[in-house]
């Protein structure tokens, strides 16, 4: 059965230049083969994978601190839904955003104008998840008592032993071992978080984990900042799986980088193909 998938997918593998011994290697070794071929140091990649049908897991550098970027916006949104479910927040009320914290004044000012100074929680959810913008994320955090308070609550969805149990607010570091637990919690409570799933199902069409999977439903939360390019995803292949994939310095990106590195992005996207293809060959038939 594995060989049948290899044969069926051979043309695309060859076209992309991403042919590996998928049916004989572990997931980590497949990823390492890709990194070796393209001269990427193993320390630049961390991932955690979980097959949702079998419960089987795989990982590489999963406790290594990695820059989270905007991936924090997923558990942040989950916290706000929890408060709505408890009856503590309204989905229809519009909240003043003129005085919220922000990262970029131009973005903040544009939101104030666009929404006449106030946003509802559904607006904040959509714009923080579909477009991954910061102003609506700060507005969500304000509903919880501010960003510092929100980060203190991230342990609700999982934690790991070590210096960074969840996501560290100070230097924006996390681990894929933590983030895959967030994805797992989200999927196990998908009815409660159906709005969040809808938005991350709509996010970044044709990009990140969706690039090579146009016919597969993918729920994804990408994160980019400086040297980091990441994506957390729930991939609904025949056998669905979770993947937290974080990277550092791909394509020569540095902590001084202010734009997405094109080569680095291509390398990350190729890695999404490699991971998904390994899954197709080894787990879809399970």
Residue ranges: model-predicted function:
Residues 23, 92-108, 129:
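Acidic helix-start/capping segments at beta-turn-to-alpha-helix junctions
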Residues 41, 81-93, 145-152, 156-162, ...:
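Bacterial peptidoglycan biogenesis and beta-lactam-recognition machinery
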Residues 11-28, 99, 113-192:
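Active-site-adjacent helix/loop patches that line small-molecule binding or acyl-intermediate pockets
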Residues 41-65:
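Short, conserved catalytic-motif segment at the N-terminal edge
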Residues 55, 66-97, 128, 243:
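Active-site SXXK
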Residues 1-39, 57, 65, 142, ...:
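Structured C-terminal helix/loop/strand segments within mature extracytoplasmic catalytic/sensor domains
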């Amino acid at each position: 059965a594995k060989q049948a998938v290899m044969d069926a997918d051979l043309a695309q593998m060859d076209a992309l230049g991403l042919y590996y011994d998928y049916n004989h290697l572990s997931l980590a070794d497949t990823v390492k083969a890709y990194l070796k071929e393209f001269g990427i140091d193993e320390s630049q990649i961390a991932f955690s994978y979980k097959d949702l049908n079998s419960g089987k897991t795989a990982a590489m550098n999963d406790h290594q601190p990695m820059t989270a970027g905007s991936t924090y916006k997923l558990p942040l949104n989950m916290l706000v839904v929890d408060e709505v479910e408890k009856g503590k927040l309204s989905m229809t009320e519009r909240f003043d955003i003129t005085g919220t914290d922000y990262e970029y004044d131009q973005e903040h000012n544009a939101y104030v104008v666009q929404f006449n100074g106030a946003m509802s929680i559904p607006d904040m959810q959509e714009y923080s998840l579909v477009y991954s913008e910061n102003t609506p994320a700060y507005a969500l955090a304000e509903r919880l008592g501010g960003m510092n308070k929100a980060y203190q609550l991230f342990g609700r969805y999982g934690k790991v032993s070590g210096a960074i149990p969840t996501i560290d607010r100070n230097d924006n570091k996390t681990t894929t071992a933590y983030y895959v637990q967030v994805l797992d919690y989200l999927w196990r409570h998908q009815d409660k978080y159906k709005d969040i799933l809808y938005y991350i199902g709509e996010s970044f069409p044709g990009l990140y984990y969706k690039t090579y999977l146009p016919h597969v439903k993918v729920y994804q939360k990408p994160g980019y900042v400086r040297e980091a390019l990441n994506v957390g995803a729930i991939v609904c292949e025949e056998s669905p799986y979770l993947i937290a994939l974080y990277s550092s310095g791909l394509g020569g990106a540095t902590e001084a980088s202010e734009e997405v590195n094109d080569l680095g992005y291509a390398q990350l996207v190729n890695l999404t193909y490699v991971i998904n293809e390994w899954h197709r060959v080894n787990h879809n038939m399970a």
